[in-house]
Structure formats: C-alpha cells, structure tokens
C-alpha cells in the first residue's frame, strides 16, 4: 500500500477482535463454552419463523422494522417509536459513536468492559478513557471523576462481561444524574434477561434525556448466528441514530425470527431458570476446590486462579478434555477463565475436569 494512503487516526490502534474459540485441534465434537451462547438454542417458534422466511427471500425487507419494534415494545412496555434495531447491539454502539463521538471527544468505559467500546471509539477518532473498577465491579465515583467537558459517551455493561457483576438501580441513577450535560449514558443490557425483575434502564430512560439502553438477541434468545440487537432511548437520540442506519440493515429472516423469539417469553423464562440453577451449582462446585468467582448475574462465571500460569494450564487441560472456555487476558484478567453456563451435563463435565486439574497440581 502506498505511504500516501492512510486510514483515519485511531484505526491502526485497534487490535483485531478475537472471539471465543470453537475448535480444538485433534478433538472431535469439543464442547464450546467460550462465547456465552444459550445451550438450549432459540425458541421453537423462532425456528419456525426462520424456516417460513425462505419463501420471501427475493423481497427486500422492511426498512422501518415495524413488526419487530412493536413486538419488543409490547413485551417490555416501551414506545415503539423509540426502538431502533441493528445488526447485534454492536451496531447500535457503532451508531452512537458515529453520531456523538469523534476527534477531541472522550468515550468512557470500565477497565473490564466489553472490548467493542474501545474499538468503536477509536474507529471514529475519539479518545477511549478506561476507568478502574473496584473488585471487578463498576465504580460509579471513578466514572464520574473521569468525566470532563470532552466526555460524550459513557458505556456501562450491566451485568458486565466478562465479570458477571452488576450495580443496582440507585447507583445507575446517581451515575446518570452526575454526568456532564453533554454526555450520554449507554446501558448495555446484553445479559439483562438473566436478571429477574431488572428493567435494564427503562425507568431511567423515561425519567431523563441522557440515557440509552442496548439489548441483543444473541444471548438468552439463542440467535447469535443471526446478529440482531436493539436500542431504546429518548426520541431525539433515536431519530439521530436512524439517520445513519442503513435502510436495509436487517434481513427479513433476521426480523421475523427475532420477532417470534421475543414473543415467546415462556422459552426465555425456562432458559433463565435453568441458567440460574446451574450457574449457582457450578460456582459453588468450583469454590469448593479452590477456584473462586464473583457472584455472576449473567450466563457465565469468571473463574479466578492463583496466577496466569495456573489459568493457562487449566485451559490447556480443559482442551484435552474437549472443553473450550475463554481466556480473558485481553480484558486485563489473565489469571481468569470465563466459562459459559451450559446444561447440567456440561456443568458437571467442567467441574469434574477442573477438579481433576487441581488434583494434579
């Protein structure tokens, strides 16, 4: 490439994103517990909608996503005019950075927050500002102290990935109230459905003009392979985001499958209950053999080892047993492994394999 052809500032500072591994060399049918996927997959009703969609693949999809937006609004008690749909919640995050950040502005997030916050900030030439957490949990005072007149966006995953920790409504309200006037608080609720009774920021959005939530169909809805997400916020902000959203950013298949998925809340409830049961079981089983974790409110636990060497050695042992988990050194947690909560058999396999590893040490 010619030296005269250069990308925009910040682009070359982006490290390539590495997703969870899917395969282990020499191991057939390895169990993937590295990407926080729903082990039960999507709702049967969503699968039926997916199959029906093949009959209209020659037609362009809806440009306003009305069917999906209204379904989301009905289920969550929202105003459909203030819902925006995208290619995963990642795209909503990208829209927010494109619309409100840029050169000479700051995008704030916590030190163990989702990697896409930094990537999206750098992609628009903004300055990423990483704020320390307290014991792997969001520190509201630290975030407020990091805000300046340059701050435009504050991203907060609640529950957080990869830690699984979360803060309560009072802290969220204090954070929203304490931000500079020009800043937007973005509450990333990718794992919100795993928390009973949690509104993921809906009440705050109705009370204030500086809060937006993002959500995804990739986790509890089991549609990670389709890439569908959505956002909700003040109408003025959503109108801005729609101006940069591509008119056909979601296919008919994505829209119809996601609509069927969100309407099947019985499936969601079953998945949430099963996840909670086996998340508690696995955390307790690992704690008994000297592998602690913080209380997780998501569909994974962050297992802590004595040091990086032990975590990496355990990961290698798990791979020999056909178990794929996620190293999280990229999140500044090299002594930890993130383990997706699978079904009962999966959780028992993980506990047995880690116990086997600890006995060999």
Swiss-Prot record:
**SUPFAM superfamilies, per this entry?**
PLP-dependent transferases
Its annotated pathway reads: Amino-acid biosynthesis; L-histidine biosynthesis; L-histidine from 5-phospho-alpha-D-ribose 1-diphosphate: step 7/9
- Under Enzyme Commission nomenclature, its number is 2.6.1.9
Keyword list (alphabetical) reads: Amino-acid biosynthesis, Aminotransferase, Histidine biosynthesis, Pyridoxal phosphate, Transferase
The reply on keyword Amino-acid biosynthesis is yes
Task: Please provide, alphabetically and separated by semicolons, the GO molecular function terms listed in this UniProt record.
Answer: histidinol-phosphate transaminase activity; pyridoxal phosphate binding
Cofactor(s) listed:
pyridoxal 5'-phosphate
Q: Name one GO biological process term.
A: L-histidine biosynthetic process
Judging by the UniProt lineage, the source's domain of life is Bacteria
List the Pfam families. Answer: Aminotran_1_2 (PF00155)
Report the residues modified as N6-(pyridoxal phosphate)lysine: 219
State the reactions this protein catalyses.
L-histidinol phosphate + 2-oxoglutarate = 3-(imidazol-4-yl)-2-oxopropyl phosphate + L-glutamate
Q: How does it assemble?
A: Homodimer.
Q: Which family does it belong to?
A: Belongs to the class-II pyridoxal-phosphate-dependent aminotransferase family. Histidinol-phosphate aminotransferase subfamily.
Identify this protein by name: Histidinol-phosphate aminotransferase
């Amino acid at each position: 490439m010619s030296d005269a052809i250069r990308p925009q500032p910040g682009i070359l500072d982006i490290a390539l994103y590495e997703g969870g591994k899917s395969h282990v060399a020499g191991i057939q049918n390895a169990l993937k517990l590295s990407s926080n996927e729903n082990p039960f997959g999507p709702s049967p009703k969503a699968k039926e909608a997916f199959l029906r969609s093949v009959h209209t693949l020659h037609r362009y999809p809806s440009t306003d996503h009305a069917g999906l937006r209204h379904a989301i609004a009905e289920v969550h008690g929202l105003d459909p005019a203030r819902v925006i749909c995208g290619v995963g919640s990642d795209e909503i995050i990208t829209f927010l950075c494109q619309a409100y950040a840029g050169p000479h502005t700051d995008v704030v997030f916590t030190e163990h927050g989702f990697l896409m916050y930094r990537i999206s900030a750098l992609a628009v030439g903004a300055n990423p500002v990483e704020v320390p957490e307290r014991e792997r949990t969001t520190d509201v005072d630290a975030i407020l102290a990091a805000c300046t007149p340059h701050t435009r966006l504050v991203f907060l995953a609640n529950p957080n990935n990869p830690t699984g920790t979360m803060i309560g409504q009072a802290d969220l309200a204090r954070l929203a109230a304490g931000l500079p006037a020009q800043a937007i608080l973005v509450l990333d609720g990718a794992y919100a459905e795993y928390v009973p009774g949690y509104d993921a920021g809906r009440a705050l959005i109705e009370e204030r003009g500086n809060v937006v939530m993002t959500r995804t169909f990739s986790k509890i809805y089991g549609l990670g392979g389709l890439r569908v997400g959505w956002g909700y916020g003040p109408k003025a902000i959503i109108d801005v985001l729609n101006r940069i959203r591509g008119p056909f950013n979601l296919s008919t298949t994505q829209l119809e499958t996601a609509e069927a998925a969100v309407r099947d809340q019985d499936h969601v409830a079953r998945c949430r209950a099963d996840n909670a049961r086996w998340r508690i079981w696995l955390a307790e089983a690992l704690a008994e053999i000297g592998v602690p974790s913080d209380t997780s409110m998501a569909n994974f636990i962050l297992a802590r080892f004595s040091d990086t060497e032990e975590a990496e050695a355990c990961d290698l042992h798990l791979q020999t047993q056909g178990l794929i988990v996620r190293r999280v050194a990229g999140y500044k947690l090299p002594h930890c492994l993130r383990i997706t909560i699978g079904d009962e058999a999966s959780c028992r396999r993980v506990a047995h394999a880690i116990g086997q590893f600890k006995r060999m040490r």
